[in-house]
């Protein structure tokens, strides 16, 4: 239901504690992104999460930079304890931090030592399944090779371009889009999460195809956004999963 997702993906953004409950009530899905943390935004995240759970809305946690600081790690872990999430979406370092309670993340990017590769793929799959079972929700680990698991099944997705890692915000964009896909397909959450990852990867490939000599990563970012906007035209493009 990609067309339904496009209708859902009309977002409202708020981090003010007095505002988030009302905004959450009129939205079909909640994406909690911890990219900007302070006392006020943290309070707003917990309030929004509680309201979304009350209403039975789909919820997603994007633990941006978890492992880079104690505040980020502790906030993400506490959110997992107090809010019922349908999906946790992050890079491998962020997700490992949630699983272990500490990490080696030096920012919002995954540590090279943690990367999922063809050589350690089986280990990565086992980790994704185990953490999904422990967390009680779908886990989407994104990187050069993407893993999406509900604890029983694990989708392995190889779409995308290495240059996507040089653009700040592609992961956050994916989390927003994934929330919309889940809100449009609440009975097929695992498939919706995997479809969002495939769509983002395809957008990266399609966008790269329009790059010209002299274009840089700012242009590429906009090409990706354009490709997502035009995704219904390219919906028949093959995915590798």
Mark where each language-model region is.
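Active-site cofactor/substrate anionic-group-binding motifs, chiefly glycine-
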Residues: 7-51
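Short pre-catalytic strand/loop immediately N-terminal to key active-site residues, enriched for Gly-Thr
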Residues: 157-169
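Charged C-terminal helix
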Residues: 202-236
């Amino acid at each position: 239901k990609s067309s339904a997702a496009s209708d859902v993906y009309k977002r409202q953004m708020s981090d003010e504690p007095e505002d988030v409950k009302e905004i959450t009530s009129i939205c079909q899905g909640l994406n909690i992104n911890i990219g900007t943390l302070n006392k006020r935004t943290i309070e707003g995240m917990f309030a929004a999460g509680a309201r979304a759970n009350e209403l039975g809305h789909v919820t997603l946690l994007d633990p941006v930079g978890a492992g880079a600081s104690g505040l980020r790690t502790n906030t993400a872990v506490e959110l997992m304890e107090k809010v019922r999430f349908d999906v946790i979406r992050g890079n491998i370092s962020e997700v490992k931090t949630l699983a272990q309670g500490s990490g080696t993340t030096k920012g919002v990017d995954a540590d090279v030592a943690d990367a999922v590769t063809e050589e350690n793929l089986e280990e990565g799959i086992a980790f994704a399944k185990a953490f999904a079972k422990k967390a009680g929700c779908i886990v989407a680990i994104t990187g050069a090779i993407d893993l999406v698991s509900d604890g029983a099944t694990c989708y392995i997705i190889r779409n995308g371009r290495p240059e996507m890692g040089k653009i700040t915000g592609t992961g956050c964009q994916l989390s927003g889009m994934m929330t919309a896909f889940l809100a449009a397909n609440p009975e097929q959450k695992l498939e919706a999460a995997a479809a969002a990852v495939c769509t983002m990867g395809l957008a990266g490939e399609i966008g790269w195809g329009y790059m010209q000599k002299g274009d840089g990563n700012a242009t590429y970012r906009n090409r990706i956004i354009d490709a997502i906007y035009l995704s219904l035209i390219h919906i028949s493009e093959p995915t590798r999963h």
